[in-house]
Curated annotation (Swiss-Prot):
The keyword Cell cycle does not apply. GO terms for cellular component: cytosol; keratin filament. Residues 73-307 are annotated as: 15 X 5 AA repeats of C-C-X(3). The gene is Krtap16-1. Sequence repeats lie at residues 4-8, 58-62, 73-77, 93-97, 108-112, 113-117, 133-137, 152-156, 177-181, 187-191, 212-216, 222-226, 272-276, 292-296, 347-351. It comes from the Eukaryota. InterPro entries: KAP. The lineage of its organism: Eukaryota, Metazoa, Chordata, Craniata, Vertebrata. The keyword Repeat applies. Residues 435-502 are annotated as: Disordered. Keywords: Keratin, Repeat. Residues 489-502 have a biased composition (Low complexity). This is Keratin-associated protein 16-1.
Length: 502
């Protein structure tokens, strides 16, 4: 008897004889070429099929494009297919015959994985491999409200399911919940190419139905930053999504969910700021300019909701561009009133100190007291501003520039630049001694004005409590402004000028 049950010539496998010449209805039959492993499946025919040659109406599977595709799992054995995750292969198109699983057009076509049975595949959710697209209209998507996982999503690819709808009918191949947890795709663009006139089926669970298919990503790539210069970046029309702040229709604010530390502000709401005259625009890529860096503890202060320029919000007491805001509540930080944006002298550069006071980094020829936040507007007028360390009891410790090169020529010698006295009152600085140091021509005049008592030469100075010694802090001494004075060298000099009858 010739083998009439084979629909085509099957390839031969090692040590397995395929498509024997002596074939009956109970013998092995070749599957179509869509099966990945090209193995066999036992076809149990009825008695009417008999020994008359195995008619093609019951034993020979035929494919139809319009029929429902049921995946069939096969293994490289004869007549006993068993299902496993690795061997769950491509779908096989079959008609509603006796020996093959049939698909009803009115029911939802789910992926089917075979167990170790004969000709009766059963579905197992754990071994579901490939999703199947079916043209069903009365089916509800098999989506769990709690997990919101796609129907058949592999953790390796994390790509949307490819859909091939032929006509304008609703398909359910897309995941019903567009919030995958284990996958991290890019901004969700539906791969299912449905014609414009087709309306896909709406998911039944209302809990997870963002219409724009916006996944909940730990690091979303579609959230524009406030520091971004692109003004056309509008948020996607999502109703409820943890990835984006609520959008206000009254303003054209750019929302952001950036959680940066230094170079980007922490924005939990749409930020609209008016770019001030002394604030340069931010650079979104590297943020090299230190004036656009705002500490994460500073809360953005937005004066007006328009014109919504992409500017960086800085706190009210620390707003000049030539200072780095390190702490929002600084007691001696005053804003700079610059007449024009170009009024940025060379002696006022953004500092990098971690002090609580806005402290500029000035050239050696210029010295700034941190409380004086008004630098000159031209490099030639950078005259040293001499202020005493302690003009009276002050309650806080002044963070002075500790470098000896920043010491001005008119700075008083009785206060070492390396000493940081602790003061005991709280009012503003007031100048005490602003005279220039004695020159060579004025040595006689300076010698005649040397005090003979232990009182300081400044009349309005008050005693201060220093950290080094208990001696009188305002004993005049002869100094050289250009030479550095250390803690050891400056300490013995006041003791040498003490009166003998003390």
């Amino acid at each position: 008897m010739s083998g009439c049950c084979c629909s085509r010539k099957c390839p031969s496998l090692p040590a397995i004889s395929l498509c024997s010449t002596e074939v009956s209805c109970g013998g092995p039959v070749c599957l179509p070429s869509s099966c990945r492993s090209q193995t066999w499946q036992l076809v149990t025919c009825e008695d009417s099929c008999g020994s008359s040659g195995c008619g093609s109406q019951c034993c020979q599977p035929s494919c139809s494009v319009s029929s429902c595709c049921q995946p069939v799992c096969c293994e490289a054995t004869i007549c006993e297919p068993s299902c496993s995750v690795s061997s769950c292969a491509q779908p096989v198109c079959c008609e509603a015959t006796i020996c093959e699983p049939s698909c009803s057009m009115g029911s939802c076509c789910q992926p089917v994985c075979c167990e170790a049975t004969i000709c009766e595949p059963s579905c197992s959710v754990s071994t579901c491999a490939q999703p199947v697209c079916c043209e069903a209209t009365m089916c509800q998507p098999s989506c769990s409200v709690s997990s919101c996982q796609p129907v058949c999503c592999e953790t390796s690819s994390c790509q949307p399911v490819l859909c091939l709808p032929a006509t304008c009918q609703p398909v359910i191949c897309k995941p019903c919940c567009c919030q995958p947890v284990i996958c991290e795709p890019s901004c969700c663009s539906a791969v299912c190419a449905v014609p414009a006139s087709c309306q896909p089926m709406i998911c039944e669970p209302v809990v997870c139905e963002p219409a724009c298919c916006q996944p909940v990503c730990p690091t979303p790539s579609c959230c524009p930053s406030v520091c971004s210069a692109a003004s056309s970046c509008q948020p996607v029309g999502c109703e409820t999504s943890p990835c984006e702040p609520p959008c206000s229709e009254a303003s054209a604010c750019q929302p952001s969910a950036c959680m940066a530390l230094v170079c980007e502000p922490v924005c939990l709401r749409p930020v609209c700021c008016v770019q001030g005259p002394c604030e340069p625009p931010c650079v979104s890529s590297s943020c090299q300019d230190s004036s656009c860096c705002v500490s994460s503890i500073c809360q953005p202060v937005c004066p007006e909701p328009s014109p919504c320029l992409p500017s960086v919000c800085v706190p009210t007491p620390c707003q000049p561009s030539c200072y780095i805001v390190k702490r929002c509540r600084s007691v001696s930080c005053e804003p700079i009133s610059c007449p024009s944006p170009s009024c940025q002298p060379a002696c006022c550069r953004p500092g990098s100190s971690a002090s609580a006071i806005c402290q500029p980094a000035c050239p050696p020829r210029t010295f700034y007291i941190p409380s004086s936040c008004k630098p000159p507007c031209s490099p030639v007028s950078c005259r040293p501003i001499c202020r005493p360390i302690c003009s009276g009891p002050i309650t806080f410790r002044q963070p002075y520039v500790t470098s000896i090169t920043y010491r001005p020529a008119c700075y008083r010698s009785c206060y070492s630049i390396l000493r940081r006295p602790t003061c005991l009152a709280s009012y503003s600085y007031r100048p005490v001694c602003s005279r220039q140091p004695c020159t060579d021509s004025d040595n006689d005049k300076c010698d005649s004005k040397k005090p003979t008592s232990s009182q300081p030469d400044c009349a309005d100075s008050t005693p201060v409590k220093t950290e080094v010694s208990d001696e009188t802090p305002c004993q005049p001494s002869e100094i050289k402004p250009a030479s550095p004075i250390t803690r050891e060298a400056a300490a013995p000099q006041p003791a040498a000028s003490k009166p003998a009858d003390r």
